[in-house]
Amino acid sequence: MSIMNIVDFAQPAKESVEYMPKAEAVLSGNPSQLVHTHFSSPCGQLAAGVWEGACGQWTVNFTESEYCEILEGVSVIRDAHGTSKTVRAGDRFLIPAGFKGTWEVVEPCKKIFVSVEFKA
């Protein structure tokens, strides 16, 4: 394997996709999202890139575990019991597979993500 296999997030992403959460998941605002995928494993279980989110709130159901590092903005993550965690630039955390709740972007947000979804 060569040095060319190292993924440099400063380079253009291999794929960029803009999307909205499903209509029934949107609780407020217009939470459009843009995902720049810099790496995706051949087996489809590991992905890494940069995510950008516009203001709004939607329900989430993580089937994958995801490491996040907030680069810009402010978001509030709430669990199914209503307990919340505010994350902002500089925060680093991992959301485990199985987490259910809501994600609210309070100020336009950008994060680096690395997600892994183990498949049977």
Feature locations, PLM:
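Intrinsic-disorder/low-complexity, polar/charged segments enriched in Ser/Thr/Lys/Arg/Asp/Glu/Gln
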Residues: 33, 46-48, 100, 110
